């Protein structure tokens, strides 16, 4: 979009009367409504207002990985930039400051520092130097059908080097934190804050209410209302999980409250999944660089710091979360109600690359982190439960799992429910990739409460 004047934001407010009246919320809503040109005008006005640039043009990228953010390119009188911002509902009433990139660099993490930043909630945006590097999410996707591990050795080695560097920073910066310090960290916007009703803070609401309450789920061979679905236990390919969705949401709302994470904190990016990682250099010597530190902090609860990368680099793939149409073409899924059980059968499975990513994170990051927490007496007895509830929040709160509510179709919705059950519940009489992972990172059997 070529921009000649600052847009009148008020002209767009009829798109959704309940929408927050902020530029970032408006831009995301306009993109969702297919009004990309108007969204680009809003971003142009935001850049001009926050940084004083004369904006010649703005182009928003079409990006499957930006589920709660926008990015693209801006040409201004001060040069050309790559821009990105993350946006959450109710962010003006949330704790913590967006985009504290400098603390990551000071801690020794490889991070791309923005040239300019606005951190005001509702007007938060970063301007980076213009770059055309690919992100690790895009590079990794190239190998999701690859069965020969020698073909993705370079990508895996780069990921291992990043995991090693991040783990070193976690161990170096590990320190006691108070309940107040935990509550002030913006990482909770990715977990508990998405479950919170700001007008009734004691009640489960937020995205849970807008995504699922009283809604219908169209699954392959079955339609269920949330009232019924939420009270069923789920089995996946014959493995039954221990808790209903209703129970898991209630537990996440209670047990992931920010004050509950008083204990151990680290300096962390907080959302360093591979769509927030640049790939630099030739294939033989790849170097990974973090960017978009929307939730970075210096007192990030240690058990939450690596949850988002663990889920989004591994269990969100192949295809089902970011490319549901591809998942529908490549995978099969069926759903059947059997008494009080929703039985899902699917041929979805982690690809060799995703399993290798999980193994690397297991050995280089989670094992040493949990071992150090235990040696300091800072590992909660129920650490496994907390990790599973946080992992559960990733698929169910990043976007609605309902077919037709966004990008999902019945097949990807069924796979998403299967993954959510695996993240939150314990397998009864069996095992799965996550249960094996958690067993393997436990400092000792007594430290892992199922």
Which residue ranges define each predicted feature?
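The N-lobe alphaC helix and its flanking beta3-alphaC-beta4 segment of protein kinase-like domains
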Residues: 91-104
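ATP-dependent phospho-/nucleotidyl transfer catalytic cores
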Residues: 139-269, 280-283
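Short pocket-lining segment of the protein kinase catalytic domain that shapes the ATP-binding cleft
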Residues: 126-133
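Active-site activation/catalytic loop segments of kinase-like enzymes and analogous catalytic loops
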Residues: 104, 281, 288, 296, ...
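Conserved HxN/HPN-centered segment at the entrance to the catalytic loop
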Residues: 105-117
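ATP-binding glycine-rich loop module of kinase domains
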Residues: 70-94
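Regulatory N- and C-terminal appendages and interdomain linkers associated
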Residues: 13-60, 90-92, 284, 371-450
